[in-house]
Amino acid sequence: MSSSNNSVVYWGTGRRKTSVARVRLVPGTGTITINGRPGDHYLNFNPAYLAAVKAPLQTLGLNEQYDVLVNVHGGGLTGQADAIKQGAARALCELSADNRKPLKTEGHLSRDPRAKERRKYGLKKARKAPQFSKR
C-alpha cells in the first residue's frame, strides 16, 4: 500500500430516514460506486436519484475530478440517495473549508429530520382512526 494513496481519501457520513451512507472521495475520473456496483445500476437509472448523488460535486464543479465510493445500508433508494448526497457534501467540506459555504447555501449539509411517524394505539395507522359509526 502506498502512503500517498491513503493520504488523499476524504470521508463523510450522511443520514436520511433510516439510511446511513459512508462516502469516500478519491481523486479520479468521476465514477460513482455504491456497495461495489456502478451508481447508475444501483439507483435503477433514476435521474432524480443520480442528480441528488451528484449535486454536491456539481455545486463546486468537481464532478469529473473525484471518484465517489459509497457503503450504504438501511431504508429505500430515496433515503439512500439523500444520505449519499449529505455524506459527499461532508467529505467535500473535509477537502477544503472554503467548500462549506456554497454547500450550505444549496442545502446539501442539512440533515432532513423527517422520519416515519409511529403508530399510536387505538388507531389503524399513525393518524388514521377506525371508521366511526353513529349507531
From Swiss-Prot:
GO terms for cellular component: cytosolic small ribosomal subunit. SUPFAM superfamilies: Ribosomal protein S5 domain 2-like (SSF54211). It comes from the Bacteria. Keywords: Ribonucleoprotein, Ribosomal protein. GO terms for biological process: translation. Residues 97-115 have a biased composition (Basic and acidic residues). One of its GO terms (molecular function) is structural constituent of ribosome. Residues 96-135 are annotated as: Disordered. This is Small ribosomal subunit protein uS9. The lineage of its organism: Bacteria, Bacillati, Cyanobacteriota, Cyanophyceae, Synechococcales.
